[in-house]
Structure formats: C-alpha cells, structure tokens
Amino acid sequence: MKVLVVDAGGRGNAIAHAFSRSEQVKEIYIAPGNGGSEFFEKCKIAELDGKKIPSIRAIDEIVRFAKKCEVDLAYIGPEEPLSLGLVDRLEEEGIPAVGPKKEATILEASKCWAKDFLKRIGVPIPEYANFDNPEEAKEYIREKFNNGIVVKADGLAAGKGVYVCDSVEEALRAVDEIMVQKKFGEAGNRIVVEERLRGIEVAFTAMTDGKTVKPFGHARDYKRAFDSDDIEGLRDFYIGLTKKFYTKAQIEQLYREGKLINPNTGGMGAVSPHPAVTEEVEQRIMEMVVEPIIENFDKEFKGVLYPVIMLVEENGELIPKVLEINVRDCDPGAEAKLPRLKSDMAEISMAVVEGRLDEVEMRFSSDYCVAVCAVSGALKGREGLKPGYPADHYTSQPITGIEEAMKEAIIYANGIAKTNGYVTTGGRVLTVVGMGQSIEEARSKAYSALEKISFPGMRYRRTIGLDVPE
C-alpha cells in the first residue's frame, strides 16, 4: 500500500510515523515535507519530475504526484489545502483521501459561522458576539469585560489569530491588530469576542466516516510563547520586536500591568493523555459536543474533527465547552498523541474512506507522551536583533545533536532542511517527544534529549507538563 501524507511540519511527520508502523503500508510519501520527513522507515519526500512539491498550497502538483505515483490513500494534515479543495480534487481522480471536502471546512474557516452553528444546535460554548466593525467590538469589550476576554480572528490564521486577554487594554489592542492593522489579512475582517473560561483546556480529536464517529485521542496543548516567569525571554522578544531597549524590571512591570502580552503561538508543546479526561469525561465530550456536530452538520464530513474543549467544573462535574472547531488534527497535539496509537493507522484510514469505521477499534497505549517544541528564538545577525518565533526570526541556522537526541526521544521535524547537515527553516524547528509510564518519565526523556540539540537562537519552554497531575 502506498500512502501520501500532505503536510510540511511535525504533525505530518507524526502522521507518517504512525503509518510506518502498519504492515499494510510499503511506501509513504510526504508532500511537501521537510528535512526531517525521512527520519522514519518507509518515509520519503514526494518528488514530481525530479523536484519537490513546492508547498501545501500546490494543489495541482500534489494531485499530479498522487496520480503518477498511483497512491492508494492520501491523508491531509493542515487546514489550508483542505480549504483549497484538495480532497475534492483527489476524489475526482479516484484517489481516496482522509479529510473533509472544501465546503465542510467552514467549521474551521469561519469562527463566527462556527460559533453561531454551535449555539443553534445547543453545544455548550462561552458567551460571545461577532463583529465586523472594530469600534462596536471595542464598545462591547468595555461593557462586558469581566476577569478576562478572548478576541479571535474569524478566518484561518495558522493558529495565531487568538488573543487571550487579561485586561481591557490588551483586548482593545487585539481588535486593532486584527481588524485595523490587518495582521492576518482578510481573516481579520470579522472577529469573535468571547468570555474567557477558566478550567482545563484540551485538544480533543475524533475520527468520523460521516456516519460513525469515534474518539481519536486528546492532548493538553501549550500555546503561550514563554513560560510565565521567563521575563528574560520576553525582554529579548520585545526588544527585537519594537527595536526599543527595555530593562528586565521594565518588562516585568509592563507585563504585570497588562501593557504587553505573552503572545500566542501555533503551539509550544503538548501532553497526552490528560488524567482529567477519564472514560466518563470522554463519553460526555462525545455526547455533548462531537456527536451533535456530526449529526447536525448538513455537509459531508469525513476525517478528523478537532474541537478545542475547556473542561469547566459545574456542580462537581467537568462540563465540556467548545472554544473553537478544527477540521484536521492538532499540532503539536498530534505529535504527543499519535506515538501512543496502537491501532493500525492504515486500517483506520481505509475504514474512514470506505464508510466502515464502525468495524475498527481505536486503541491507544496507556503511556504518557510529553512533546516540547524547540523554536527559533531571539537572535542578533546581519539584520540586527530579530525577536524570534512567533514573530520574525532568522533561518538557515546549523543544527547539531539530532542523531544523539534520537537515542532518548522521538524527533519530529517542523522546520528544517537537510544540506550538508541540518539547518533551520522555520519558527518551530523540532518537536521532541518523550514517552514513559508516567508524565515525569516522559518529561525527563524529552528534556534530556533537548539538551543534546543546539542551534543559534534555540529556545523552548521548560514547564511543559508540569501542571498536569499524575
């Protein structure tokens, strides 16, 4: 069996790794992939006429490759090619694909639409309002602010369009960045403003063939760029961002007063599973959230449904409330949960495209995985000091220690290229995954492996998993 995985980062490499463990699979192609996509057996970068596929947006080239290589199955990782209709195109050519068609991506492509849909079908959500006028949004924030508020760009923003605000000033700045300064382009033409919930946030995934829907693992995701006590890191970031000098004390005061934020990212790490998601809680999420979405959504949907859940305690029970919906697997949550998958990835995927998911059992190891992202941090170079991920960062920095780190942990490449050695190409560079019978054992393996890796400007959060009870 030949499988094509469409992705450019760590999630795609984790998906390919899961397929590589199936005896049914002989070859796995990753398009466009990256310099670490061939870390695992059976995996190779897709090439068309001797050239790599240029990007996840190169729909024509991806379809041509799939036809030419006669792949038996395609699995789409990111939201962008899904929203561009890649599954539609592949199926037109007779190539089965795991992922929703273009019209079904509205669930992720418009947060405003999704919030209205969830409210209509009775799925628990935070109090919210949608806006296409920044001044009206600001007026609402001034009236409604109570212990935090969240501002979200309506459209696709690579996981960076969400601002979790601790003060009115932060929220007003978020509105300006999204709607006035157009930080995310047309994705910020509309916004969602919602109450900030307190609880346990979980990236919950389910797999569906359009009829049957089953849990597909979950993770605790870490979005903030810096640990809460990493004032030195915040200082370097904001000096690089604003080109102004700050002392550590000034940054600490501005941070405490809510005049600067710890920025959100696509993800700095993840832990899977979370002990709070017991069988009872998982069933509650399925019954209150996942099943109603699939049953009431009027468009064909097959593939991964990924609602971001806040588990809020009410009357002694953890109640799931949906923060947003995604139509693909989580990242870096996938890197934390897929190493635990014991079921055959190829068998699951074929059951999805053939409409017989009811015949397949989803089994995950009881082990814990802790995934920590090594990112391109603040670095001074030819163009001066750059702030680093999630803002502008240097690339082409040499990486050492990957092979040594592989002896202790699983390494998924997010943004690297292979030349004479390995060099950085992105903000998120590597996701290092430790696996063990306890969270502490998994953390120890991940951080021990990270100490063996080095590149200029490298940084990572040091507290991933510390807040998760055993």
Curated annotation (Swiss-Prot):
Mg(2+) binds at residues 324, 326. ATP binds at residues 142-203. It comes from Archaeoglobus fulgidus (strain ATCC 49558 / DSM 4304 / JCM 9628 / NBRC 100126 / VC-16). Belongs to the GARS family. GO terms for molecular function: ATP binding; metal ion binding; phosphoribosylamine-glycine ligase activity. The keyword Manganese applies. Transmembrane segments: none annotated. Binds 1 Mg(2+) or Mn(2+) ion per subunit. It is an enzyme of class 6 (ligase). Pathway: Purine metabolism; IMP biosynthesis via de novo pathway; N(1)-(5-phospho-D-ribosyl)glycinamide from 5-phospho-alpha-D-ribose 1-diphosphate: step 2/2. GO terms for biological process: 'de novo' IMP biosynthetic process; purine nucleobase biosynthetic process. Residues 115-354 form the ATP-grasp domain. Pfam families: GARS_A, GARS_C, GARS_N. It comes from the Archaea. Its cofactor is Mg(2+); Mn(2+). This is Phosphoribosylamine--glycine ligase. It catalyses: 5-phospho-beta-D-ribosylamine + glycine + ATP = N(1)-(5-phospho-beta-D-ribosyl)glycinamide + ADP + phosphate + H(+). Its EC number is 6.3.4.13. Keywords: ATP-binding, Ligase, Magnesium, Manganese, Metal-binding, Nucleotide-binding, Purine biosynthesis. NCBIfam families: purD.
